[in-house]
């Protein structure tokens, strides 16, 4: 641990723009779908209040159905690429643009609405 703190002393931190952070967050959430982790995808949605576990399970089933529909329609999701984002940090909202690649070689650009909550970009 001591070595790590000394090694990082000489590095300068690189500021990352809110747009870049939102873009990265959206990609991570869709990467969860790509890798079949529907629970992590569902947990990426902003909810101001807690929800019952039974409702969370329904949302996970819905995400699995979405993944299944992509398999049926396009031979599955095979890649997720960040294509940019626009954010309004004063209003704590943004939208990220992702390019989804499918097994049938088609691509689709989607808009992912996001909300900034406690410093984290979350799905809206």
Residue ranges and their predicted role:
Residues 1-9:
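Sec-dependent bacterial lipoprotein signal peptides
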Residues 3-4, 14-17, 39, 86-87:
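Short amphipathic alpha-helical segments, especially helix-boundary/capping motifs
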Residues 5, 26, 94-96:
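Small side chains
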Residues 9-35:
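Short, low-complexity N-terminal intrinsically disordered segments enriched in polar/charged residues
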Residues 23-24, 28, 39-89:
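Short solvent-exposed beta->alpha transition segments
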Residues 81-124:
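Exposed beta-sheet edge and beta->alpha loop/turn motif
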């Amino acid at each position: 641990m001591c070595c790590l703190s000394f090694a990082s002393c000489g590095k300068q931190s690189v500021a990352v723009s809110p747009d870049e952070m939102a873009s990265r967050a959206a990609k991570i959430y869709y990467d969860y779908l790509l890798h079949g982790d529907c629970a992590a995808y569902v947990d990426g949605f902003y909810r101001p209040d807690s929800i019952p576990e039974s409702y969370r399970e329904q949302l996970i089933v819905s995400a699995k159905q979405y993944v299944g529909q992509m398999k049926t329609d396009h031979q599955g999701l095979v890649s997720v690429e960040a294509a940019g984002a626009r954010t309004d940090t004063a209003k704590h909202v943004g939208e990220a643009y992702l390019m989804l690649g499918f097994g049938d070689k088609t691509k689709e650009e989607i808009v992912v609405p996001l909300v900034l909550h406690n410093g984290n970009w979350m799905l809206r």
